[in-house]
């Protein structure tokens, strides 16, 4: 992501990427300069073991103007046209310094699908639709800064998995027991040991490689249209920021394996069958593991309401908004009282009939 200058073919002014297109636009004369990829450029999967060895031994290096935040430890590149004095991740004042960083360069990215004006409209719609929010939140909430378009680093992993397991299958038995002159129903589970093997192929398990944003919010921006990935091209970064990864390739794969295991356990339970399942042991082998280092588009901003600042993120492709928000405890209390009243009426009507 080295600093590169892209000039307009018509007037020579600086260009910026126009979201939602495959062109760079000159804001001086309006001329559009198409982004044409090499016919040999592809979005390639990289062998995990080979990539890990490269990361440890001789990852490609480049010198960029890196913005370092001392509060949240974010390191990211800002386009020179972006006049930012605060970290877009946590709002702390930032210092621009040029230094050499060593990292795996991205192999692909998803271009932004809409501009900052559209991002603001999506934020306002999200704010208006919040349940149990104060009535005046839309009128009083003020965004702290302009919207910053940031390419956030991700790893994606593919793997062919084979999992051996041992466990127990539970079958529910309902029987009637006579106790003197009375009968009662007894429910019990009969367990039998079982073992087996399940297999599943995983494609593009995404892992956030940034620690500067709450992972939960970024996870809820999914799904990403990864089928629209384009080979990495610095021209798509003009007018936007790009963060360097903070989660390494190996640590990212550990997170990916945890995501895979959740799915695999569901497969095992289906394979065990019965009414209830217990997994005693599970051993998974991972084969044909490949990865991609990609940049995904996120709009960042925060707003002030009362004495607090609330951060939020927007998927730069789908417009999905996630973030912190204020709550109206008065509305929540009234809703709770209403629910209690409904339950009370139900018990009074139907309980009295019984």
In which residue ranges do the predicted regions lie?
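Juxtamembrane boundary at the C-terminal end of a transmembrane helix
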Residues: 344-354
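Residues immediately within or flanking Cys/His clusters that coordinate Zn2+
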Residues: 3-5, 23, 62-66, 84
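Short, non-ligating residues that shape and space the ligands of small metal-coordination modules
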Residues: 17-18, 35-36, 78-79, 96-97
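Short cysteine/histidine-rich zinc-coordinating motifs and their immediately flanking basic loops
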Residues: 21-25, 38-44, 81-86, 99-105
């Amino acid at each position: 992501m080295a600093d590169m200058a892209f000039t307009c073919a018509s007037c020579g002014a600086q260009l910026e990427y126009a979201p939602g297109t495959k062109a760079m636009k000159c804001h001086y004369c309006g001329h559009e300069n198409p982004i044409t990829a090499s016919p040999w450029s592809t979005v390639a999967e990289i062998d995990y073991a080979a990539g890990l060895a490269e990361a440890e031994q001789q990852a490609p290096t480049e010198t960029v103007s890196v913005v370092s935040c001392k509060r949240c430890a974010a390191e990211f590149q800002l386009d020179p046209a972006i006049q930012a004095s605060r970290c877009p991740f946590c709002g702390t004042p930032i210092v621009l310094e040029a230094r050499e960083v060593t990292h795996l360069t991205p192999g692909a990215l998803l271009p932004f699908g809409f501009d900052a004006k559209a991002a603001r409209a999506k934020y306002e719609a999200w704010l208006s639709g919040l349940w149990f929010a104060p009535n005046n939140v839309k009128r009083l909430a003020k965004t702290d800064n302009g919207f910053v378009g940031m390419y956030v680093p991700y790893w994606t992993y593919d793997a062919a998995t084979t999992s051996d397991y041992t466990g127990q299958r539970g079958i529910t038995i309902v029987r009637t027991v006579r106790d003197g002159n009375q009968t009662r129903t007894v429910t019990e589970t009969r367990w039998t040991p079982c073992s087996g093997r399940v297999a599943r192929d995983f494609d593009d398990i995404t892992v956030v490689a940034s620690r500067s944003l709450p992972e939960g919010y970024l996870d809820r921006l999914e799904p990403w249209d990864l089928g629209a990935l384009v080979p990495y091209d610095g021209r798509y970064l003009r007018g936007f920021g790009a963060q360097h990864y903070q989660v390494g390739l190996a640590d990212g794969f550990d997170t990916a394996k945890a995501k895979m295991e959740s799915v695999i356990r569901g497969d095992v339970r289906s394979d065990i069958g019965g009414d209830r399942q217990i997994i005693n042991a599970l051993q998974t082998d991972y084969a044909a593991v490949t990865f991609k280092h990609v940049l995904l588009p996120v709009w960042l901003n925060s707003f002030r309401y009362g004495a607090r600042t609330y951060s939020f993120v927007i998927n730069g492709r789908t417009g999905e908004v996630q973030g912190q928000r204020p709550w109206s405890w008065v509305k929540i209390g009234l809703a709770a009282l209403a629910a209690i009243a409904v339950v009370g009426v139900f018990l009074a009507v139907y309980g009295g009939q019984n």
